[in-house]
Amino acid sequence: EENNISWSRQLEEAGCLVVYGIDGLKVHSKLCLITVKSDDGIQYITQIGTGNYNEKTARLYTDLSLMTANYEIGDEARKTFQEILIGNTIDRTQHLLVAPNSLQQPVIDMIEDEIEYAKKGEQSYIGIKVNSLTDKKIMDKLVEASKAGVHIDMVVRGICCLIPGVEGETENIHIRSIVGRYLEHSRIYIFGTKERDKIYISSADFMTRNTLRRVEVAAPVYDERLKERIRNMFSIMLKDNVLARTALPDGRYEIIDDGKKKLNSQEYFIEEAYKQKIQKLKYGELRKNMVLLQYQFSGGFLWKQ
């Protein structure tokens, strides 16, 4: 992109080493690694996102971003960058899922895990939010999971080659599309029930161009508070009866008329963001007043610089 070329030139002129990717593979991951060296050793601060570093689309797209000081995740991010630097792609990872070599198969393996739970008569669950779904291997595994009794909820905004609700095949798969003021762009993978779930945010849709022909990164979410937040977000999307359309076995999409109170998921998240902002402002004002009182009680003065 023209804008990328401009920034790359400016970075090079400033003395930065700019690597333009790998021949034959598009680098579509959204990955940033900050390495801090100190007397205590090396610390990594890693940011993994679902959306581009683009100030224009950031105002129009819905995305998720994770920042973590987890050393092992940071080290895998370092290895990912290291491989790209020499024109290779990373093969084995313990935490990150990195396409084209180690994303599709781990996803299939986690679907298989849910199949095994279902076969044992235990609760099983898969929740997926992507822009598009065309990867045949993943779709075949999801059908197998449905047949085994795994409950599968999917939010697929765009192209979807999987037909839900077919008796004996995909009757346990529920698919909806959400199209609203903002472009739904985040990718979320949830495998397992709340007590044992694995949750990832990702740059990759479930398309073979993403899983096999691009550099993509999916990051695990380990913090329980963040996992709960993502679960709640996904739950709200599944309750949306304003922007959402549900996919039918005949290929049509239908307006949701469930008789429940109208819920626009995008408006809900905006309202929640405003509430959090107001709470932070109130907290900041409270702290300022507490500092002022402390100075007054101590007989001091608080000067504004």
Predicted region positions:
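Acidic/polar active-site rim loop that often engages polyanionic ligands
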Residues: R59-T62
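PLD/PLD-like phosphodiesterase catalytic module centered on the HKD motif
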Residues: E1-T57, M67-G74, P100-W303
